[in-house]
Design a protein with these regions (language model features):
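Acidic/hydrophobic-patterned starts of short beta strands in beta-sheet-rich repeat architectures
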Residues: 47-55, 135-144, 302-312, 356-364, ...
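Solenoidal tandem-repeat scaffolds enriched in leucines and small polar residues
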Residues: 384, 393-415, 419-444, 457-459
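Blade-loop segments of beta-propeller domains
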Residues: 330-354
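Beta-propeller blade repeat segments, especially FG-GAP/WD-type strand-to-loop junctions
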Residues: 7-22, 65-69, 96-111, 149-159, ...
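Gly/Ser/Thr/Pro-enriched helix-cap/hinge segments flanking short amphipathic alpha-helices
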Residues: 91-100, 104-294, 371, 422, ...
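Beta-propeller blade termini
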Residues: 37-46, 126-134, 291-302, 322, ...
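Residue-level signature of beta-propeller blades and closely related beta-rich strand-turn architectures
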Residues: 58, 147, 314, 365-367, ...
Length: 718
């Protein structure tokens, strides 16, 4: 079943170098600006950063659902001639909306200061032109308002500036080189709705220290014009030199990217077992039937090279790709299916899955655990580690949350290895209890006492830590300061990110570039599993839970008689008056959406959000490796989410994110044009390993509905 995403919002496309552009509108705070027509970037306050101006309004509020119902009723009962249709159109109210000016706060964040700056006319504004009408060196504005006089806005900023005019210079670039860096602007013409600008560019001259040079790079290749030591608060008109002075362009120096793709090296494409998720519950945040494929890495044919295996959908077996020479792979499909779910991601430090390869791997890829072969509920995760300290690998089997029981709790089943025979350990299971909606888990010695502890990430919850006491687990999440961060946590990966000898971990989350950013006061999830399951979000204001979604969506999951007759009334309704058994719903207030690292401070964890480019897209999987061979641990984030509700579109502003560790708990993001990664699909997990044995870490990344991508490491010296 296919649900087509819709994009009823603004986008802000940020260049990543090369041919990649990512949308950050939610993160930047500009996704919703009413009915908008024109957008301009200019440095309104002359602080060195471009601000954003938006004109708004429309003659008819076509989104007024109450008016649409009145029109529909009139169409069914009245005349359909042109005059009658015009009169019906007048049933839609005028949509006056204030214009908006967003101040650039840095790091791609914007704040609406239209009222403060005097650009908040409440009406219907279509055209927007920019020019220096009073010749004072800054840029002024003119707008065209429907059924009103135009508006003229004078820029009253007193900050120092330098203006440059290039007659006939459309497409040329002007650079101001200063002590603090270089600012670049391009001469553009048109591009606005019913509007054009005069073509001047203005630089803030008091930000980067003394201005050292103006450089004009002409569009047609004419040799650049340079002006040494430009005078502040001056207007420069630069005439293009003779075409005889053409610049002969040399070769562009290209740096070697960190990774090189091997196209079609592994021809595995994942197609999950789809269900009618949104037909079952149209209020779901995302689909649950688009799970990522399980993957593993082992030397299946004992030739000394690491091979790869992927679980096929619908229990069709496992597809194995044999590593022939480090660059080429051969596909072999096993008929083995995985009823016990043992192809879940393993929580080992090396990131390998739990399947144990055998020389005769076709049809026998796994040493199953007999005690759980008969279980019918699929596993989200199967972990292996020595929990009871007897030197043998035990197993934890964690049930997954499915569409039919969301948002029910995950449960763990513990199996102790006793001389090769697995015994179910009920005492261990009872010590864990209900685990929440587990999305990832790791067995690792977090408290350095020599045994394996359990770390879990949760959807609609906080990260949990359970210490191993030798005969049971003890929940120490609150003591370690982890319960205060409630989010949509996904993948986990462990390492020592600050080189203090303690185990730290990284956790994936929704990020800060999603529809959740439209609700700065935060959202509350209301959920109930079982036969009367329900999952929805609400805005909490005092004791009232206000709806986030359209009334029509609620009509699919609650009694229509409980809903008001008018859509406008529904926007202010308390959901407690709509939902059956409201008191039985679990309420979860979300307060943390940032993908983060947690640094172990000995008895406490310090959370640090990863740098802001890592928050542009949801992170489902995380890998730890030294990608640049500098001796410090780096991160690979598997990102993007295509399975949101159709009216919320897709979250796909990542090509796979590399973050280079600095050895002190900090990470520096690598732009896609530098990393060489182009994992543009819905990527949930990856394997990182040196499979061509050149001393550099390579990447194999899966994509839901997409081609598996293979990248060879090229960074640093082996």
């Amino acid at each position: 079943w296919t649900y087509v995403p819709r994009f009823n919002r603004n986008v802000l496309m940020i260049s990543q170098g090369g041919q990649q552009w990512f949308d950050t509108a939610y993160y930047s705070g500009v996704a919703a600006t009413a009915w908008s027509w024109n957008v301009r970037f200019l440095d309104a306050d002359l602080d060195g950063d471009d601000d954003m101006l938006v004109t708004n309004g429309f003659a008819f509020d076509t989104m007024d659902m109450d008016a649409s119902l009145r029109i529909k009723s009139a169409q069914q009962s009245g005349s359909k001639d042109a005059r009658a249709l015009y009169e019906m159109k007048k049933l839609q109210p005028r949509y006056n909306s204030p214009n908006m000016l967003f101040r650039n706060e840095g790091r791609l964040r914007f704040t609406d200061v239209g009222e403060e700056f005097g650009f908040a006319h409440d009406g219907i504004t279509y055209g927007l032109g920019v020019a220096d009408f009073d010749n004072d060196g800054d840029l002024d504005l003119v707008t065209n308002n429907l059924n009103e006089s135009p508006s003229l806005y004078r820029n009253t900023s007193q900050e120092p500036r330098i203006q440059v005019r290039l007659p006939g210079g459309v497409g040329s670039k002007v650079r101001l080189v200063g002590q603090g860096g270089t600012t670049t602007r391009e001469i553009v013409s048109g591009g606005g709705y019913l509007s054009s600008d005069s073509g001047e560019v203005v630089f803030a001259a008091g930000v980067a220290g003394q201005s050292e040079m103006l450089v004009v790079e002409w569009r047609d290749g004419t040799k650049p014009t340079r002006i040494e030591r430009p005078v502040v608060n001056s207007i420069y008109t630069v005439i293009k030199p003779s075409l005889a002075r053409l610049l002969v362009r040399g070769e562009v120096t290209k740096t070697t990217p960190m990774f090189r793709e091997l196209p079609d090296a592994i021809s595995f494409r994942h197609f999950p077992n789809l269900a009618k998720d949104f037909d079952e519950n149209p209020l779901l945040f995302k689909r649950f039937s688009t799970a990522a494929p399980a993957m593993l890495c082992r030397d299946f044919d004992n030739n000394g090279r690491l091979d790869f295996g992927f679980q096929l959908a619908r229990s069709a077996g496992v597809q194995v790709f044999l590593n022939l020479d480090g660059d080429n792979f051969r596909s072999v499909t096993s008929r083995y299916n995985d009823p016990s779910g043992l192809m879940g991601n393993a929580g080992w430090l090396d990131g390998f899955a739990v399947i144990e390869g055998k020389p005769n791997f076709v049809g026998a890829l796994n040493k199953t655990i007999p005690a759980i072969e008969s279980l019918t509920q699929p596993a989200a995760l199967t972990l292996r580690g020595d929990m009871d300290g007897d030197g043998t690998a035990d197993a934890i089997y964690i049930t997954q949350n499915t569409l039919n029981d969301h948002p029910a709790e995950s449960r763990a089943m513990v199996f102790l290895n006793q001389s090769g025979s697995f015994r179910r350990a009920v005492d261990w299971e009872q010590s864990l209890g209900a685990l929440g909606q587990v999305t990832s888990a790791v067995l690792v010695d977090m408290d350095e006492d020599g045994d394996t502890d359990l770390l879990v990430s949760r959807d609609l919850g906080a990260i949990g830590l359970y210490h191993n006491r030798g005969d049971r687990f003890v929940d120490v999440s609150e003591a370690f300061g982890m319960l205060e961060f409630v989010g949509l946590w996904q993948g986990l990966a462990v390492g020592d990110f600050d080189n203090d000898g303690r185990v730290d971990f990284a956790a994936g989350n929704l990020g800060r570039n999603s529809p959740m950013e439209l609700y700065p006061d935060g959202l509350v999830h209301l959920g109930r599993g079982g036969k009367s399951r329900l999952s929805l979000y609400a805005i909490k204001r005092g004791s009232v839970h206000l709806p986030v979604d359209d009334m029509d969506l609620y009509a699919n999951v609650v009694d229509r008689a409980r809903l008001p007759a008018m859509y406008r009334q529904f926007s202010d309704i308390d959901l407690a008056k709509v939902l059956d058994s409201f008191d039985g719903l679990r309420r979860t207030r979300l307060n943390c959406f940032e993908t983060s690292v947690f640094l172990n401070r000995g008895g406490k964890f310090e959370r640090r959000a990863l740098p802001y480019p890592a928050q542009f897209s949801p992170t489902s999987g995380i890998n730890v490796a030294d990608f640049d061979n500098d001796g410090r641990e780096d991160l690979l984030l598997s990102q993007n989410l295509y399975s949101l509700r159709p009216d919320w579109g897709r979250l796909d502003s990542s090509a796979g994110m590399i973050l280079l560790g600095q050895g002190d708990g900090r990470f520096e993001p690598v732009r896609a044009g530098v990393s060489g990664l182009a994992i543009l699909g819905d990527s949930r997990n990856a394997l990182v390993v040196d499979f061509n044995r050149d001393g550099r870490t390579d990447i194999v990344a899966t994509q839901t509905f997409g081609q598996t991508q293979v990248y060879l490491g090229q960074a640093g010296k082996p």
